[in-house]
Curated annotation (Swiss-Prot):
Pathway: Amino-acid degradation; L-histidine degradation into L-glutamate; N-formimidoyl-L-glutamate from L-histidine: step 2/3
Source organism (scientific name): Citrobacter koseri (strain ATCC BAA-895 / CDC 4225-83 / SGSC4696)
Pfam family, one: Urocanase_N
Molecular function terms from GO: urocanate hydratase activity
Binding site for NAD(+): 52-53, 130, 176-178, 196, 201, 242-243, 263-267, 273-274, 322, 492
Organism lineage string: Bacteria, Pseudomonadati, Pseudomonadota, Gammaproteobacteria, Enterobacterales
Protein name (Swiss-Prot/TrEMBL): Urocanate hydratase
Any one of the GO BP annotations: L-histidine catabolic process to glutamate and formate
Keyword tags: Cytoplasm, Histidine metabolism, Lyase, NAD
Length: 561
């Protein structure tokens, strides 16, 4: 029998050094689960929705209570198993095993459709975990800001001689992921017009300083963009409207942005993309009363949206999919050339993945922002020669408001993750920070995801859909001693289109933690280098050889073995 997914209760993680659980290794997942549902973090916390349509932290409130209860009682040699947001077992393992193992939204491939998943969800038998919602390591929109920033910067390098001043980005979606776009564009030096159909989401981004201002109409928005680009100012403008209407209208008017993308929740047509001409309340009601008709209406609107994006691409405007599967939805509605513009990974990000570079993140369990500022300084000390990274950290401190527990995102690769993790652990040991640090990442990383319309689109060897890689990543992180490990399906692009894994490890200042950190923070990014080397990317082969990886089928890594 389905239990309640709604509770009028605000959740905030404990701060300080007083433990609710029996050790920091179980206190950490407890605090991070609670932090995912902090009103300053989650999109709809009273319904357990963290971000990304219906990406939840727990299946229902009864399951949430049971998870919290289990974590408070968990012993140092026990492991909690969580199945689609429901705690299903506690087993005796050992002290270096993960304290929590999570599997979310996984379906046998033939049944891996939204229709079947929604049936299970309605019966209380499943939960959509997105990527970091159900794996308890979401840190608000900051979690994707740097990745979006790196994408815009690389687009500027490729198309505009590395200078986005006086240029503007057209995009849509200001949810938990899309909400990073306006700030990322501003940090990259560009203006942006950000279309969002829910005023509450615009209010959230204005309050957290991710978007600068809101226009009253499309004409007003364009006037603001024209003024700011003429003045060379990087200002983000939000517009409350439907992208399915506005983007085609801009094509009709002959307006020419400098970059075009989209980050609406198009991956979930039943819950995440407002059909043209509908109000949000109407959409929610019809999703319950006529799900099939609602999905078709949403996908028809997506088709219009993608046709407009294609028109911009044909004008010569750099246009790219930002990983929400909108091209696939449009293709299913008859837009045969929907994939004529690329996804952001093959267009701009893959060379980073080849070196194991991706969204490394950490959180101060103390709740003290000073702990993050001290770790920022430590990153600069260790990665001493990377001016681009130092610039990012300076901008992040100046511009990014913490949401919930203080956190930082920082794209680093195989060469640095282990060193940083060990340094953070030493800071905890010496009392330089006031409580342990947790280190995790997005599932959007170099070796932890198979997603043919996003992270693994257009792989050199054609292995886009091979999902052995995230399974191996999860298994290796478990064997290496991560504090919690997760294996999900459908994140980012929806049911049937992705499989992906996550890990989190606690720096509690002990020697045992140092040994686990050394294994996990080497092996985890190394799987990304391995995956790309196996696909034939020379950058990855070179990185594997430089970092001493042992890849039996890659001659360059064998040396004198």
């Amino acid at each position: 029998m389905p239990q309640s997914k709604y509770r009028q209760q605000d959740i905030r993680a404990p701060r300080g050094t007083t433990l609710t659980a029996k050790s920091w290794l179980t206190e950490a997942p407890l605090r991070m689960l609670m932090n995912n549902l902090d009103p300053d973090v989650a999109e709809n916390p009273h319904e357990l929705v963290v971000y990304g349509g219906i990406g939840r932290a727990a299946r229902d409130w009864e399951c949430y209570d049971a998870i919290i209860n289990a974590l408070t009682k968990l012993e140092a040699d026990e492991t909690l198993l969580v199945q689609s947001g429901k705690p299903v077992g506690v087993f005796k393992t050992h002290e270096n095993a993960p304290r929590v193992l999570i599997a979310n939204s996984n379906l046998v491939p033939h049944w891996a459709t939204w229709e079947h998943f929604n049936e299970l969800d309605a019966k209380g038998l499943a939960m959509y975990g997105q990527m970091t919602a159900g794996s308890w390591i979401y840190i608000g929109s900051q979690g994707i800001v740097q990745g979006t920033y790196e994408t815009f910067v690389e687009a500027g390098r490729q198309h505009y001689q590395g200078n986005l001043s006086g240029r503007w980005v057209l995009t849509a979606g200001l949810g938990g992921m899309g909400g990073a776009q306006p700030l990322a564009a501003t940090l990259a030096g560009a203006c942006s017009l950000n279309i969002e159909c829910q005023q509450s989401r615009i209010d959230f981004r204005l309050r957290t300083r991710y978007v600068d201002e809101q226009a009253t109409s499309l004409d007003d928005a364009l006037a603001r963009i024209e003024k700011y680009t003429r003045e060379g100012k990087a200002v983000s403008v939000a517009l409350c409207a439907n992208a399915a209407d506005v983007v085609p209208e801009l094509v009709k008017r002959g307006v020419r942005p400098d970059l075009v993308t989209d980050q609406t929740s198009a991956h979930d047509p039943l819950h995440g993309y407002l059909p043209s001409g509908w109000r949000w309340e109407e959409y929610q009601a019809k999703a319950a009363s006529d799900p099939q008709g609602t999905v078709q209406a949403a996908k028809r609107s997506m088709a219009k949206h993608v046709q407009a994006m294609l028109a911009f691409s044909e004008m010569g405007v750099p246009t790219f999919d930002y990983g929400n599967n909108i091209r696939q939805m449009a293709k299913e509605m008859g837009v045969e050339n929907a994939f004529d513009f690329p996804g952001f990974v093959p267009a701009y990000i893959r060379p980073l993945f080849c070196r194991g570079i991706g969204p490394f993140r950490w959180v101060a369990l103390s709740g003290d922002p000073e702990d993050i500022y001290k770790t920022d300084a430590k990153v600069k000390e260790i990665v001493a020669d990377d001016k681009h990274l130092h610039h990012w950290l300076d901008m992040a401190r100046e511009r990014i408001n913490f949401q919930g527990l203080p956190a930082r995102i920082c794209w680093v690769g195989l060469a640095w993750r282990q060193k940083l993790g060990l340094a953070f652990n030493e800071m905890v040991r010496r009392g330089e920070v006031s409580a342990p640090i947790v280190i995790g990442r997005d599932h959007l990383d170099s070796g932890s995801v198979a997603s043919p319309n996003r992270e693994t689109e257009a792989m050199r060897d054609g292995s886009d859909a091979v999902s052995d890689w995230p399974l191996l990543n999860a298994l290796l992180n478990t064997a290496s001693g991560a504090t919690w490990v997760s294996l999900h399906h459908g994140g980012g692009v929806g049911m049937g289109f992705s499989q992906h894994a996550g890990m989190v490890i606690v720096c509690d200042g002990t020697d045992e933690a140092a040994a686990r950190i050394a294994r996990v923070l080497h092996n985890d990014p190394a799987t990304g280098v391995m995956r790309h080397a196996d696909a034939g990317y020379e950058i990855a082969v070179e990185c594997a050889a430089e970092q001493g990886l042992n890849l039996p089928m890659i001659a360059a890594t064998q040396g004198k073995r």
